[in-house]
């Protein structure tokens, strides 16, 4: 593998001149520049990314720490982030944590060693350990992409889960539903709890109370939606509608409903959350709460690039508002 010394020798110049040509850190005569570039091409020389970053103070790379890249919601955001990074000439290092503090620590240390220009963080929950870890890397520009901790060292983008939960509850109430269940991820998780609180607000505005037997907790997985729905179907008294904490739980719930010989929305109305790509292809197409994954990813990167350019600027909190997407999984009881 060729070195910078080999390039300098072939071009008949100093290693300093070669460095200036590569990093564009000083004017070099056009003829000399051409000779150096020809030598680089002949030797197939590739400068060390780390060495170059020490010269120009950028690696043109971003780190992204997520709970998991398998879940459809995370996967769609990651795709949007990677696409925007590519268009801006940046590379993306993706790190999955499964909310394991040890993994978060190792990933943060690895990203710091690779001298990434900044880090995006998107975890479904933040433990005390992970918050402390993030504070210890506060010299790195960092944007938290979900509900996020209140941290003066990071910018935040809020997804307004409370507002989304309210929109879901209100849509069901407006369609004449009074007996409504909530299939939730663990309520200790902020996202699930905020969606539930917004949902309760819509019920209370309509003078309705939540039946505690119809509040079932699982996780953000289709298996949990399936199992929770089966527990609901086993009860003597059943709701007319089900609000699911996310779309994949809703798909699991619909599977349980159809297995038992019931139909959506004729027998049970179902509404999801996130508007992941597959939700429009369920049977029937799923009514859901839309969060623009492309807008979230692009806005997070814009904010991170701003922070990379100016590390001393005041930290920002930006809100992204969810929207109701009406398809065919909710029955209007007012017409019957």
From Swiss-Prot:
InterPro entries per the UniProt record, alphabetical: HTH_LacI (IPR000843), Lambda_DNA-bd_dom_sf (IPR010982), Peripla_BP/Lac1_sug-bd_dom (IPR001761), Peripla_BP_I (IPR028082), Tscrpt_reg_HTH_PurR (IPR023588)
GO biological process: negative regulation of DNA-templated transcription; purine nucleotide biosynthetic process
Organism domain of life: Bacteria
Domain HTH lacI-type: 2-56
Residues passing through the membrane, by range: none
SMART domains: HTH_LACI (SM00354)
Record-listed hypoxanthine binding positions: 73, 189, 191, 220, 274
Pathway: Purine metabolism; purine nucleotide biosynthesis [regulation]
Keywords tagged on the record: DNA-binding, Purine biosynthesis, Repressor, Transcription, Transcription regulation
Biological role stated in the UniProt entry: Is the main repressor of the genes involved in the de novo synthesis of purine nucleotides, regulating purB, purC, purEK, purF, purHD, purL, purMN and guaBA expression. PurR is allosterically activated to bind its cognate DNA by binding the purine corepressors, hypoxanthine or guanine, thereby effecting transcription repression.
NCBIfam families hit by this protein: PRK10703.1
Name under which the protein is recorded: HTH-type transcriptional repressor PurR
């Amino acid at each position: 593998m060729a070195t910078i010394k080999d390039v300098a020798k072939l071009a008949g110049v100093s290693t300093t001149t070669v460095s200036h040509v590569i990093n564009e850190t000083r004017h070099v005569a056009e003829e000399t520049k051409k000779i150096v570039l020809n030598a680089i091409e002949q030797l197939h020389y590739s400068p060390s990314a780390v060495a170059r970053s020490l010269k120009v103070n950028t690696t043109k790379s971003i780190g992204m720490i997520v709970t998991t890249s398998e879940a459809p919601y995370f996967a769609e955001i990651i795709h949007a982030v990677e696409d925007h990074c590519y268009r801006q000439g940046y590379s993306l290092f993706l790190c999955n944590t499964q909310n394991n503090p040890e993994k978060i620590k190792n990933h943060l240390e690895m990203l710091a060693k690779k001298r990434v220009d900044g880090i995006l963080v998107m975890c479904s929950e933040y433990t005390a350990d992970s918050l402390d870890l993030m504070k210890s890397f506060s010299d790195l520009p960092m944007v938290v992409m979900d509900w996020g901790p209140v941290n003066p060292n990071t910018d935040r983008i809020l997804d307004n889960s409370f507002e989304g939960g309210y929109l879901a509850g209100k849509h069901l109430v407006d369609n004449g539903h009074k007996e409504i269940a909530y299939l939730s991820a663990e309520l200790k998780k902020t996202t699930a709890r905020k969606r539930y609180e917004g949902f309760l607000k819509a019920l209370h505005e309509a003078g309705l109370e939540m039946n505690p037997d119809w509040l079932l907790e699982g996780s953000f997985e289709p298996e949990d939606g399936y199992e929770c729905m089966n527990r609901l179907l086993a009860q003597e008294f059943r709701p007319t509608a089900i609000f699911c904490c996310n779309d994949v739980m809703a798909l699991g719930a619909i599977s349980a409903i159809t297995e038992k010989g019931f139909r959506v929305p004729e027998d049970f109305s179902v509404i999801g959350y996130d508007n992941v790509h597959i939700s429009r292809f369920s049977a029937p197409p799923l009514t859901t709460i839309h969060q623009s994954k492309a807008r979230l990813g692009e806005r997070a990167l814009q904010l991170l690039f701003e922070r990379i350019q100016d590390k001393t600027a005041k930290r920002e909190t930006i809100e992204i508002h969810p929207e109701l997407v009406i398809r065919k999984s909710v029955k209007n009881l007012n017409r019957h």
